[in-house]
A protein has these predicted regions:
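N-terminal beta-alpha supersecondary unit
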Residues: 1-64
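Phosphate-handling active-site elements
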Residues: 48-55, 83-93, 107
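Glycine-rich phosphate-binding/hydrolytic loop that grips phosphoryl groups
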Residues: 180-212
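Surface "functional belts" at beta-alpha junctions
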Residues: 34, 89-185, 213, 218-219, ...
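Stable alpha-helical structural segments in soluble proteins, enriched in small hydrophobic residues
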Residues: 46-50, 85, 103, 187-198
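SAM-dependent methyltransferases
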Residues: 1, 200-204, 215, 220-224
């Protein structure tokens, strides 16, 4: 049976999840700015709970962004360190997709407009549709001002709004059937998406793991 570890530090939440012997174990905490100190102990505790060592892992899934730049870098650094040492592949997963998958799990919704507050008066935005239990991207993930967010051109039916970007709901033209602006990515849902990717043969070598920031400029431009 496949044994997968999933971890995410891209937002205020820090979470890990483990699939072993067909069972899922998770640990989730909202601990802003403590991810670097907490992540490895959380992984160690989860493995101990399952009674296995790191060598039992087949692959490691992680939140590749978009999200907080420091948080995304923490995940990449830890994943590459573990994967190099173990000679195991990795599974990069979009944090917007993880939000959509969580909305499916908790709310039973099949169409989700996922949005993460990107600061600088922008949101990370992606629209997802359920297919055989997996939330799949429709269109592209983007970073944009809330008022520019839109559903896919072929959109119909009801859409659910998930993520902190919906704190800008009054500026978003899309009117969802329901929303949860407090929802953060959870490694349990990252694990689900990572397992789908694993079974499709989409694992990559750790060296190829790259963050997806969506935004190139992270600092306020200097005056000329």
């Amino acid at each position: 049976m496949t044994t997968l570890l999933a971890l995410d530090t891209a937002t205020e939440a820090c979470s890990v999840a483990l699939l072993h012997d067909g069972k899922v174990l998770t640990h989730y905490e909202v601990i802003p700015r403590l991810h670097a100190q907490k992540l490895l102990p959380m992984i160690k505790d989860l493995l101990a709970e399952a009674g296995i060592g790191l060598s039992a892992l087949d692959a490691i899934a992680f939140g590749r962004g978009p999200g907080a730049f420091t948080g995304v870098r923490i995940a990449i650094g830890v994943v590459q360190g573990l994967a190099f040492g173990l000679d195991r592949p990795v599974l990069p997963v979009s944090n917007l997709a993880v939000l959509a998958q969580r909305a499916l799990r908790e709310n039973g919704v099949s169409q989700v407009a996922a949005a993460i507050d990107a600061r600088m008066d922008e949101v990370y935005w992606g629209c997802y549709r359920e297919s055989a239990g997996e939330m799949r991207l429709v269109g592209a993930e983007v970073v944009l001002p809330p008022q520019n967010a839109a559903l896919p051109v072929d959109a119909s039916g009801q859409w659910f709004g998930a993520g902190t970007g919906w704190g800008y709901a009054d500026r978003i033209a899309v009117k969802p059937s329901g929303q949860d602006a407090a929802m953060l990515p959870h490694a349990q849902d990252l694990l689900t998406l990572g397992a789908f990717a694993w079974h499709r043969g989409e694992a990559i070598v750790a060296d190829d793991a790259q963050p997806v920031y969506l935004r190139d400029k992270v600092a306020t431009p200097k005056a000329r």
